[in-house]
Amino acid sequence: MALLNQVRASTTVPYEGYVEARGRIGLPDVPRAGRVVALLGETTRMRAYVAGPERWRVDELTPIGERDLYHEPWGTTLWDSGERRAVSTVGEAAVRFARPADLLPPELGRRVAAAAEPGEARRLPPRRVAGVEAVGLRITPRSPETTVGRVDLWADPRSGLPLRVELTARGAATPILTAAFLDLRRRAPAPDLLRFYPPDDAEVQTDPSPDLAREIDRFSPFVLPDLLAGQPRRTRVARAASTYGR
């Protein structure tokens, strides 16, 4: 399907915009699991400035301040305006916790489109999103093992950039995760917006990239099988930490 391929190819499309993501996924509060529970169970408000896959900035807006994530080819910098602290991380681990930027409609939409198989996608009626008459697509996974019932997305007809994504669990009537632009400017952000300039009172530190998979492999006596719950292992080497399925 042409629209599906257009969504997959939209990784280099620049944009600026305001996004709201609403999650209704109930997860237990796991210690040291980052902000995964809040991201998937609450409303996350973000401003996004994206020049491309290697240079972007996403500001998470909270009642007490902002948490701004700057991504450049060398790594990332997280600035917490409430704590007045900046942490730069060199590189990026193969396995990491979810972060607000993962909930942007283009990120969610492209991830789903990349995993879709032939015959799983069909067109939906258009929908107006952030001032754009967006074209719709429904992806319904065929695998009986998945808990995802369907994913509906609407994209910019010119660029294929996903503007709204709704994920509905199997057997559910309403989405458990929705992410959508409320405001969108289809242009490249100014270079200065993508560079972090620490304030004079900021505490600045640099951390190595946390490789969770490596730490699990280091201490676990177990190696996961090639097949788990009917899904093949995606990682090439058998390890204690692996990913499976699509």
Residue ranges and their predicted role:
Residues M1-R55, S88-G91, V95-R128, S209, ...:
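N-terminal leader/targeting segments and the immediate start of mature chains
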Residues T12, T43-R45, P53, I64, ...:
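Extracytoplasmic
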Residues Y15-A21, M46-A48, E54-E60, R67, ...:
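One face of beta-strands
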Residues E42-T43, R195-R246:
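Accessory, solvent-exposed terminal regions and/or long lumenal/extracellular loops of proteins
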Residues T43-R45, E66-D68, A86, V148-R150, ...:
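Short, mixed charged/polar active-site loops
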Residues V50-W56, H71-T76, G82, V132, ...:
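Short, solvent-exposed coil/turn segments at beta-strand boundaries
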Residues D59, R122-A202:
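Gly/Pro-enriched, hydrophobic low-complexity segments
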Residues I64-E66, P73-D156, V165:
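Long, acidic/polar, low-complexity amphipathic helices and coiled-coil-like
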